[in-house]
């Protein structure tokens, strides 16, 4: 990887080395130096910027990067819009820069003035390698009702030139000549360079641990001593109660072993605040208490290992010691596959090569680089998908094709089949019929006892214990327990990480379970992100951030594990993966109507870019990825209330966000890996992306696209052949069509869509390939339809007149027993669907073998094109 210096930029890029990496050309790319119409700069003629140590964007790399001092001077506004019809605006400006501090600062309020002038300055310490976007919110102060939020300006600080004053006039409403005038100054910080870890999208900053011990100055009974309320702003813990003790404290004493710990970013200008207990005094019959204000102490003056003593009133002392946290992260920042998965693939290749030689009757063994990566991709559909998947897998097993697959991906009801099978470490090498018989026993049994009072009391106790462990209990956890009782006889202690036993020798395909990460108050149209689970890791492929599966649900800060929580039992994961209750009303409307844009647009905030061409062409342009300056105007009270109702998710699954504290790299939008999955409105608003959220809100993928393709389309996996098993209700081709459209928009190699949309004209199997695109996978598509099965009970074996009734499988009729909402089937209904699915696989053996040959030939052809 070569390094190049950015040329001719007086801003943050001067003398800074940046890694050269592949980029994708996107329409509307926001690269380039641009100024507002009234933007000006003033050179302060100060010395050069210290160099930056290079950090590679595709791996997890460390490097040193300087911090800078930012001064923001809010000067004035002109022609402020009126929030109230009867009076002028009581205007103030709020400043929020979450990459420097979570605290919002504000100017004073100037009442009844259309042209307020503040001339107030605010200081921040910022890190030059993260995307710093300042939010300037103009508000109208109200004494009785909540303040009115008039608008917010989003300003990318990458535009600022180092050691140059930048004077900006933001044209907020050109028609009304409304204008906000602000001045920026970026200077050197006295702090030493900060150690960063980054993958080119996310950045982990330096973290310290503050140990706090309280000591009582006076001898008193322990029961009379009061806890001290200690807060460290910007820390993970924020506020803790510290119990004072009587023993003297030193750095090596046992006191610090039981001290309260606060994890905080070292260069965030954090402060410790201590609430002073009330002091009581009496005079005769009168007894009074007196409370003093909190005591504050900046932490930037506290050196590593140094113990600082802070007097707290007359009765207590606070002893504090700061130690650096390990630079090694517990979150893996990187886009490559984890070592455990790479090791599995090496073992699985041996199994696949042997199976392909037997199935295709090859004369010679396949070389390691000639073995295609074959995957089975299942969609969702409740009990229908679970049942049908058993039949499909049985058919593949009878054709000896299960050993040819390296991956199985699924969502929703398909995960019920996958999780059940992977309880057996050798399931794919055993006859599946006993497992299918066991599944039938549970599908046909009465589900009502699962809701009896004694069972509900057990659920309540389970959920209470889960809450005590540290999880946020939601309705989907109850749904997971219900699935467990409906599909099993007893409590299942298995966990996702336990499925590694089924992969230890490469004996089974690697299972990947897919969900989407959403926001509680945002429609899926505006925001959703692919979130994958495997026995090895869980994570978000867009950010290149993964954690071991046994740590999912634990608490992290800045990439470091700060509180471990016991791993969830698999039933809770099943509730999450098939969380059919997590839809909000707007998403439900979008799924059932074609006119969703009316409600979607009407309830949205108004967003507009306000920057024009620069008037100072002599100022050089920066190569950094700069966001346009944007004005966000909130919706009306009515539209906000309506949207709040429409987008509220009552039963969404919430888990602690393992990206908490991490920040976005200044060039995250230019990163090709991020761009590959950048598909939502909020991707250009870094302060609103997942790293800034406290919790992950995970949802059944079927509410967006009912397919589990994305994990297989990662360039690190690069599947050569995907066997698409479809189980959705309604249009059988819709998930495939949506995937094709999505891949076209995202420039992801995928075969072209050329199938009829009507279910009546569909065949049992389609072979799709794109010879013009060598990186596109071959796809064999199996819609869930009843075609030749009506007349044939096995390939080439016709049904007798008495057996014709067995071929009548009503999958999608108005009275179908296979509706997604149905959890219980009759034995005959279950058997028909399993046999239909098995038949459709067996009857298309030739198409499957053709696809396998094409995959092998493609692999050999690509090998021949590679230089030796």
Curated annotation (Swiss-Prot):
Stimulated by cytosolic Ca(2+). Stimulated by anionic phospholipids such as phosphatidylserines, phosphatidates and phosphatidylinositols. CDD domains: C2_cPLA2, cPLA2_Grp-IVB-IVD-IVE-IVF. Residues 857-868 are annotated as: Required for localization at membrane structures. It is a peripheral membrane protein. GO terms for biological process: glycerophospholipid catabolic process; N-acylphosphatidylethanolamine metabolic process; phosphatidylinositol acyl-chain remodeling; positive regulation of endocytic recycling. InterPro entries: Acyl_Trfase/lysoPLipase (IPR016035), C2_cPLA2 (IPR041847), C2_dom (IPR000008), C2_domain_sf (IPR035892), cPLA2_C2 (IPR040723), LysoPLipase_cat_dom (IPR002642). One of its GO terms (molecular function) is phosphatidylinositol-3,5-bisphosphate binding. Residues 324-856 form the PLA2c domain. Its EC number is 3.1.1.4. It catalyses: a 1,2-diacyl-sn-glycero-3-phosphoethanolamine + a 1,2-diacyl-sn-glycero-3-phosphocholine = an N-acyl-1,2-diacyl-sn-glycero-3-phosphoethanolamine + a 2-acyl-sn-glycero-3-phosphocholine + H(+); 1-hexadecanoyl-2-octadecanoyl-sn-glycero-3-phosphocholine + 1,2-di-(9Z-octadecenoyl)-sn-glycero-3-phosphoethanolamine = 2-octadecanoyl-sn-glycero-3-phosphocholine + N-hexadecanoyl-1,2-di-(9Z-octadecenoyl)-sn-glycero-3-phosphoethanolamine + H(+); 1-octadecanoyl-2-hexadecanoyl-sn-glycero-3-phosphocholine + 1,2-di-(9Z-octadecenoyl)-sn-glycero-3-phosphoethanolamine = N-octadecanoyl-1,2-di-(9Z-octadecenoyl)-sn-glycero-3-phosphoethanolamine + 2-hexadecanoyl-sn-glycero-3-phosphocholine + H(+); 1,2-di-(9Z-octadecenoyl)-sn-glycero-3-phosphoethanolamine + 1,2-dihexadecanoyl-sn-glycero-3-phosphocholine = N-hexadecanoyl-1,2-di-(9Z-octadecenoyl)-sn-glycero-3-phosphoethanolamine + 2-hexadecanoyl-sn-glycero-3-phosphocholine + H(+). It is found in: Cytoplasm, Cytosol; Early endosome membrane; Lysosome membrane; Cell membrane. It is an enzyme of class 3 (hydrolase). One of its GO terms (cellular component) is early endosome membrane. Its main location: cytoplasm. Residues 46-170 form the C2 domain. It comes from the Eukaryota. PROSITE patterns: C2 (PS50004), PLA2C (PS51210). Its cofactor is Ca(2+). The active site is at 412 (nucleophile), 700 (proton acceptor). Optimum pH is 8. The keyword Magnesium does not apply. The modification Phosphoserine is found at residue 800. It holds the Pfam family cPLA2_C2. Calcium-dependent N-acyltransferase involved in the biosynthesis of N-acyl ethanolamines (NAEs) in the brain. Transfers the sn-1 fatty acyl chain of phosphatidylcholine (fatty acyl donor) to the amine group of phosphatidylethanolamine (fatty acyl acceptor) to generate N-acyl phosphatidylethanolamine (NAPE). Similarly can use plasmenylethanolamine as a fatty acyl acceptor to form N-acyl plasmenylethanolamine (N-Acyl-PlsEt). Both NAPE and N-Acyl-PlsEt can serve as precursors of bioactive NAEs like N-arachidonoyl phosphatidylethanolamine also called anandamide. The N-terminal C2 domain associates with lipid membranes upon calcium binding. It modulates enzyme activity by presenting the active site to its substrate in response to elevations of cytosolic Ca(2+). This is Cytosolic phospholipase A2 epsilon. It comes from Homo sapiens (Human).
